[in-house]
């Protein structure tokens, strides 16, 4: 299990507000249960007090460049300045990065800069980030590009001690993942695939980052 950088734990009295930004997989497209990996991961960490609130914004086919352009406005619109000031709301941002950079031909250097811009901006806002990388495609050529992209994203996060989940590394060659994709007309996972992604996220330190589990 990877070591998750220490993130200040929220006060037991505060609510946890997750602001999640990403592409269509963040929204659980193709999931018959309409939960996606995020819904499953949060449900696993949600206690009886239901103190975790999720405010998600997903854009189909979003590249890192598009995310770098919109993240600030999206986060600011979902923040509670009063809650941040009085400590009643603990804000956290989840970034769900997709494969669009590979498909759009964006260079690795540019992809790195785009993610760095977002993470450095969140640091200035003093909001902890958790990054989930793009999963494999059923197309081997695309998956090869995603592996390189994910490695670049992981390096950016590592330099900033921000947790990163390498889903392409965890799911490439996984029989259940590949079977799930083979049934999809749009190269999206179904219930099984999203469950596998959620498992990787949970075992990538999601609960420790939230402060809801060790």
Regions found by a protein language model. Name each.
Residues 29-33, 105-109, 140-145:
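Short, solvent-exposed loop/turn segments at secondary-structure boundaries
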Residues 2, 136-214:
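Catalytic His-Asp segment of secreted/periplasmic serine-dependent ester chemistry enzymes
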Residues 96-100, 118-148:
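Active-site segments of SGNH/GDSL-like serine hydrolases
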Residues 77-90, 125-126, 208-210:
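Glycine-rich phosphate-binding loop signature in dinucleotide/nucleotide-binding domains
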Residues 1-60, 65, 70-80, 84-85:
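Serine-esterase "nucleophile elbow" of acetyl-processing enzymes
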Residues 17, 91-94, 128:
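Structural motif
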Residues 108-117, 145-151:
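Charged helix-capping and loop-helix junction motifs
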Residues 57-62, 95-102:
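Cell-envelope and extracellular/periplasmic
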């Amino acid at each position: 299990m990877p070591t998750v950088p220490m993130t200040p734990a929220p006060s037991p009295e505060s609510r946890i507000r997750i602001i999640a930004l990403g592409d269509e997989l963040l929204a659980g497209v193709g999931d018959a249960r309409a939960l996606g990996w995020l819904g499953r991961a949060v449900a696993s960490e949600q206690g009886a007090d239901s103190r975790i609130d999720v405010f998600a914004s997903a854009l189909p086919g979003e590249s890192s460049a598009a995310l770098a352009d919109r993240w600030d406005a999206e986060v600011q619109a979902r923040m509670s300045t009063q809650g941040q000031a009085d400590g009643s709301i603990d804000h956290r941002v989840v970034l769900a990065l997709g494969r669009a950079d590979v498909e759009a031909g964006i260079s690795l250097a540019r992809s790195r800069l785009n993610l760095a811009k977002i993470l450095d901006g969140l640091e200035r806002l003093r909001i902890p980030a958790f990054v989930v990388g793009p999963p494999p495609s059923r197309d081997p050529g695309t998956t090869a590009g995603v592996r390189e992209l994910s490695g670049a994203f992981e390096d950016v996060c590592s330099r900033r001690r921000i947790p990163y989940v390498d889903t392409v590394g965890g799911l490439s060659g996984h029989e259940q993942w590949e079977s799930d994709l083979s049934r999809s007309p749009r190269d999206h996972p179904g219930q099984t695939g999203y469950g596998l992604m959620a498992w990787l996220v949970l075992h990538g330190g999601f609960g420790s980052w939230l402060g809801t589990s060790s």
